Structures are given as C-alpha cells and as structure tokens.
C-alpha cells in the first residue's frame, strides 16, 4: 500500500508519522548527534519570521514532510541571490546524509530538499553582513544579481555599501525603479555624473514614475544639456499613455484597452553598461491585462507534470529504501544465527568435556572472528584472560584488545612485557606499539622504581626523540637535564630539582661534547650545596674537560677557596681521567638515555596528576613541543588523562595547541573522542578559548565534531556547534 496517496484530514499517513517522530525528543536528539551531514556549505534566504510554508525553523536539523509542496530551496552562495525573490536573513545550509527519506532535487535550475541543517544567520539588511559574505567568496562586482536583489528589497545601507566597493550602480537604479523604491534611487545617485542621472531619469519614465522624473529633469537640466529635449518628449508620451489608460477605466468599459504610444517611443530602450562586458537592454512595453485561457491551461498542465515527476521520483526512492532495509535486516539475522551457532557449539563442547578450556585453536578462532560473546563465555569458564589478551595482540585484533582491557580488566602491562621478550615482537610491532600507547595513557610508569625499567620503553624505540630538550640550548650542546639544572642554578636554588632528577635515575657522571660533567657546571655557578650533594653520591671530580680542567681546577681559577677546601676534603683515591670526545662513547649513550628518561618522567607526572613535577621540569628548561614516536605531545597525553591544570600549564608554556599526531589527531580531537569516559567539557572549552581549530581533519578525514557525534556527550557537541557557527 502506497502511504503517500492515502489522505487523512488533509495529511498523508507519512505526514502524520513524520510529525510524531519529530515530536519525539529522544529521536530528535539521536538525529542531532548521529546524523552525519555534508561538509559543503550551501545557503538559503528566509523571511523575517524565518518560516517555510508557515512552519517556523531554527538552527539545527529541520525536517519537512515528503510532500513536494513542503520543501526548502538552497544553493551555493554565488547563485542564491539569482533565484530568491524576497527575504531578510541568509542562513548556512548543510545537507544531512544517511537519514531515511531525505531527498534533494533540481527544478528549473533551482535545488530543493526536505531536510536541512541550518547554521549561522546573516542579516541581509546590514552592510557589514556583505563584508563577511565577500570574505566567504561572494562576488558582488561581476555578478549583478546581488546589487539587483538588495535594490529590489530597498535595503539602502547595503546597496550603498555594495556600490562603494564597485557594484554596478546602473543595475541598482534599474531594480529600484522597477520595484518602486524611489527613495533608494535618490540616496545613491551622483548629482555630478551625467550618465547616472540620465539612466535614473530614463528608468523612472519607463516605469511611470513621472513626477519624480520630471523633477529630476528640472533639477539637472544644465547637466543633461541637449538630452533634456529627448527626455521631455519621452516623458510627455508616457504621460499621455497614463491619462488614456485612466480615461478608459473610468468609462466603465468591461475590458481594459491597451494604451498606444507614439511611434517615436513605442519601443523605447535604455542601455545600461555592466562591467564593460555586457549590456542590459530594457525593452519597456505596456503589459497585457489579461492572460488567455490557453496560457492558463498550459501553465496548469506544466504544474501537473512537475508534480507527477516528483511523485514518481518519490516512489522510486521509497522502493530503493525498502529494498536496502530488507537486505540489511536479512544480513543482521544471518550474522546473529552464525554467532548463536558458534556459541551453542562452544557451550556444548564445554559441557561435554566438563574441564577447563585449553584448546588454543578455539580461542584463536573466537579472537579472529572478534566474537566477544564467545570470549565472555571462555572467561566465565575460567580461561586465563591474560592469555586471551596475548593471543589478541599477536593476531593484531585491536577491538578485542580494547574490549579485554576496558571491560574485563586484563593485565596489559604484563602482556606488554611478555610481548617485548617474545619472538612475536618484530612480527607484530604495530600491536606492541598500540599496547604501549595504552600503557602511557594509564600511568605506565606508576610502579616503576628501577631506572633500567623506565628506560626499557625508550630502548624499544617507541619514542624517536625526547619530549623534553633544554630550551635556549641547541641540539649540539648535548646537555643532560642535571647539567642544565646545575648550569642554571644560582646560590643552590636548583638543589631540589637536582635531587629529583637524580631520584629518577639520571647519570651524574654524564659528559657533554666539551667534556664537562654536572660537577663542572655546579662549580662555575659556585653552588656549594649541589657540589656537596654530587660528591656525596660519588660524582667523579677527576674528569678533565676539553681544556684540560677538572672541577677542582675551575674552583682554583676562580679563587674560590671555600670550594677548594671542599674538594680537598674528599679522599684522593681516584685517578684523573683525561678529556675525551663523547661521540660514540658510553657517556654519549648515558646522555641519550638521560634525555629519553626526561620524557618518561613527564609522562609519568601527567598520568599521576603531579602538577608540581611537570611545572619544575618545564621551569628547568625542557622543550614542551617535542613529540614521541606516535607524534603525540605532552598536551595530547594531558588531555587523554583529563588533567585540566596540566593542560593549562602546557598551553601557557607555548605548546602548539593544534599539533597533530601520526593519525592526524589534535588534542581537541582526543578530548572529543574520549569524552564518554569522563566529562571533558572544561578541557574542550579551554582548548576552544585558546584557538583550538574545530575543522582540522585527521587522516581518516574526520574532524573533532565528527568524533564527538559518536560519544553522546550533548554538552560538548552543542559547544562545538556554537563555536563553529560563531567562527563561520
């Protein structure tokens, strides 16, 4: 049964269904959040009440009935003024996709649709609106439709602005005269330009605004010169025509008689230049007052044909939707049947064996097919969940990995370590890295106490470069964080930082490219307490730098007797070590490990929400903008871990807020992607307030708002839409 053709109280059954659906708030919210829409922006022009077919519309998704009379016209910015007669507000239009019964069509070169997402609103009466539209690509100079439209609407300020930037004033005069907007003509004409005055007078005579035309001829007679005679003749001819028409109407004749013009002016034409390339020829004739029956019949027949064409199109689309829906339902049932069969067989096998499952092939089959129901059953029967996670990793099934970690509490750290030591490490390198990223976001260094264990991730090359390198020092300086702290310290003010760095396992005997150690830099800064601390830890004060100086020699050169006494109090049982290059040496390795360890410290501090630790590391001169192996910055990590204070600290320290990782994702995208886990509204709002860009695309061609639509966080979604509307 075709529901479109069965009417009830003036409505089709489908109209009634759509009304009920639209009134359902849950369904409306689902559409707003879930319905993808085209990224291409169109426009439409609405009246002052913003109604379509007497139905109010507003920002967001607007759904009309499928009846062809209830539709909205839209088009590109440079075409919309050509096809729209009247209006006050220009609206952004986006087309929803993947929504059943959405359609669009083109009739007489105009585009129509029954569903739109309305965006930003522009007031076409204001001149500043056109400044924005020109920035969006509106051509107001070569396209005369814009100036013609504003003059027709009698928008004086807008028309004057367009003329001031080069729009065609003659087109404005013609349009204003045609639609009787005489005050607009008076406000835009230039009293010193003969060509403009001549155009205005001819247009007003042609459109029978005879009183104003006569007044203008009188005022500008000196400027018009010899043209006055021709204009006066044209004016008198049209005056007689008007009087003749009035006389005919007053005689009570049942039919109006077409007034006759003199031969001289019957086909009077006014030529108006358009951008030196085209000419508008206005042939003004008196219109017939009646339309013949034949023309009315023809128009009616045309309208019926259009209606039938749309009706056929509607039926075709409905059939397609029904066929596609049926195929999808059949496929879902088929998959459910297969899944139930597998689960039943597995349960039967478990029941018969009555023992714990040890068949790895069965587990692998469930993992490869990503059958989470089967895996749940296996776990309930006592199968080792960490072994399932291990098998999921070597089979590169990331959906299963996420499910086991997020929902079943699998020990991902244990499995990660097992993978690093196994033969599968290089074969499944991408999965191992994926697990490492999960460890980073879940405080992977939280229980680590051994420096070698901290550095293990760096040795596996998950991070190509250190996240923190001293600022103000080039890469060639090769200074470790402890060296930086000692060099920057004055009166031992960095002692606490040095102690913290030592506690994290930095090598106090590392040497830079000029052969100096942390002790050399501490002596240069006369930091007695730091020197005492380093010597107590066994720092080697016998190292010579490239100039042949030991730390003690530097103290002697500076005549610092207090430091000399300090060095002389240390037992002299060590041999002076000559200077050496650090390239390809153990010191170079230690230095690189120290710098990589700095990255681990920062990540650990973020994961543990240790604001003060991150602050101290940044104050010591670490570069906040470097990236790890996945091209993530500290800001990415702080956003994922929902640390607002650390996010604020990093942004205020100059980190790139729109930096993209190897998947093309920005910190804003990650905040949107993980917003279902905990509320990240404050972080999203802070990022947006600091110029985070919404429309940057990741490598999968998705933006932050696309990722947001999958998490059902309505507050963040509305915030993104609001900012997007303001910025565009």
From Swiss-Prot:
Pfam families: Ank_2
UniProt KW keywords: ANK repeat, Coiled coil, Repeat
PROSITE patterns: ANK_REP_REGION, ANK_REPEAT
ANK repeats: 142-171, 173-198, 358-383, 384-414, 477-510, 514-543, 547-576, 594-626, 630-659, 663-696
Biased composition (Low complexity): 244-267
InterPro entries reported for this sequence: Ankyrin_rpt, Ankyrin_rpt-contain_sf, Multifunctional_ANK_Repeat
KW Metal-binding (keyword) present: no
Domain of life: Viruses
Gene3D superfamilies per UniProt: Ankyrin repeat-containing domain
Region (Disordered): 244-271
Coiled-coil regions listed in the entry: 292-338
Name of this protein: Putative ankyrin repeat protein L271
Source organism of this protein record: Acanthamoeba polyphaga mimivirus
Lineage of origin: Viruses, Varidnaviria, Bamfordvirae, Nucleocytoviricota, Megaviricetes
